[in-house]
Amino acid sequence: MRIAVRPFGVLGTAMASSGAVRKVAQGPVPGLAILDPAGLRFIRDGPRGAGGAAGQIYRWLEISEHDSFPAPVRQAIRAPLQAKLQYYGVRACLHVVGPDFSQRHCSEDEALGELTQAYGAALREFAGARLGGLRLLPISGGIFAGELKPQLPSLTAGALRAAFDALPERDQHAVSMARLDMCIFEEDEHARYAEAFAEETERAQQFTASLGMGRTPTQPWQTGVGV
């Protein structure tokens, strides 16, 4: 699994501690999917009125005023921990409904299990698409993290690894050939996620080296250089 932690959100913007939002990286390009932390209510009732990261994504997809999601999305996602990849023209969006930890007590082990299921659903969808890259973000972040917010970076890293390890070999291969970026919108949170994913990013570098290709060339849309 080739993954890096990026200091910007899936759309290439970042929020400073002051609350100011600025563009720091190129937006998603064709062949690159982005993850949408969808709310089940909005999947059922339509994207109109969604806020936060999902609202920004729906505006980018030009569906923020639509009354409903496409039928394949509504049919595939009927409960939390489910996912569906959908194309909007040339833009690919991986809708995922994660667990909501804000309204209930949940142990770290229980949270890890639920997050693993959510990331597993997302990775299976992505593996079947054969796309070149995926911009992820922490599922169940923000207000949905509840009392588990301090543990979310380590839970996210552990869940993503467990989800990948549980994939069939063919899906592991497909995911490994793509580039995964864990995108952190809040600048104050980036260091915590970089630390949590340190082992994963080291493994990614070792995996790339094992292919005999050297380091994978880093593109401007990945880092923000040249934006």
Question: Can you say where each PLM-predicted feature lies in the sequence?
Answer:
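Macrodomain-like recognition of ADP-ribose-binding/processing modules
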Residues: 1-227
